[in-house]
């Protein structure tokens, strides 16, 4: 297991209150865990990009879920009500699935 920090975006740099960072666990389909320390106001796109880069896969090939809801690039931990040690689940995107009648 390793810790990696998703760097805050430039609009987040002005707000440096204590306790603004939380640790999140990202768990893949293979049960692998990667821990991230993120600011409550950072867009989760940064975490998603960092995870995909570490896994060596394109971002559009995965979907990220928190409490069963898909995470949009512009969501923040604060908007989603995330807390310390919350879990983000990662699944491979599936396309197709039409019936052949």
Curated annotation (Swiss-Prot):
The gene is SUMO1. It comes from Cervus nippon. The record marks 36 as: Interaction with PIAS2. Cleavage of precursor form by SENP1, SENP2 is necessary for function. Polymeric SUMO1 chains undergo polyubiquitination by RNF4. InterPro entries: Rad60/SUMO-like_dom (IPR022617), SUMO1_Ubl (IPR046332), Ubiquitin-like_dom (IPR000626), Ubiquitin-like_domsf (IPR029071). There is a cross-link at residue 97 (Glycyl lysine isopeptide (Gly-Lys) (interchain with K-? in acceptor proteins)). Ubiquitin-like protein that can be covalently attached to proteins as a monomer or a lysine-linked polymer. Covalent attachment via an isopeptide bond to its substrates requires prior activation by the E1 complex SAE1-SAE2 and linkage to the E2 enzyme UBE2I, and can be promoted by E3 ligases such as PIAS1-4, RANBP2 or CBX4. This post-translational modification on lysine residues of proteins plays a crucial role in a number of cellular processes such as nuclear transport, DNA replication and repair, mitosis and signal transduction. Residues 98-101 form a propeptide. There is a cross-link at residues 7, 16-17, 23, 37, 39, 45-46 (Glycyl lysine isopeptide (Lys-Gly) (interchain with G-Cter in SUMO2)). PROSITE patterns: UBIQUITIN_2. GO terms for cellular component: cytoplasm; nuclear membrane; nuclear speck; nuclear stress granule; plasma membrane; PML body. There is a cross-link at residues 7, 25 (Glycyl lysine isopeptide (Lys-Gly) (interchain with G-Cter in SUMO1)). GO terms for biological process: cellular response to cadmium ion; cellular response to heat; negative regulation of action potential; negative regulation of delayed rectifier potassium channel activity; protein sumoylation; roof of mouth development. This is Small ubiquitin-related modifier 1. Its main location: nucleus. Belongs to the ubiquitin family. SUMO subfamily. The keyword RNA-binding does not apply. The modification Phosphoserine is found at residues 2, 9, 32. The modification N-acetylserine is found at residue 2. Pfam families: Rad60-SLD. SMART domains: UBQ (SM00213). Residues 20-97 form the Ubiquitin-like domain.
């Amino acid at each position: 297991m390793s810790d990696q920090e998703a760097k805050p975006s430039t609009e987040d740099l002005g707000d440096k209150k204590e306790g603004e960072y939380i640790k999140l666990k990202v768990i893949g389909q293979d049960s692998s865990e990667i821990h991230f320390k993120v600011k409550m106001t950072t867009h989760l796109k940064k975490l998603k990009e960092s995870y995909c880069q570490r896994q060596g896969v394109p971002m559009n090939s995965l979907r990220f879920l928190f409490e069963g809801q898909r995470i949009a690039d512009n969501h923040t931990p604060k908007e989603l009500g995330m807390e310390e040690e919350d879990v983000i689940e990662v699944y491979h995107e599936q396309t197709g699935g039409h019936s052949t009648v």
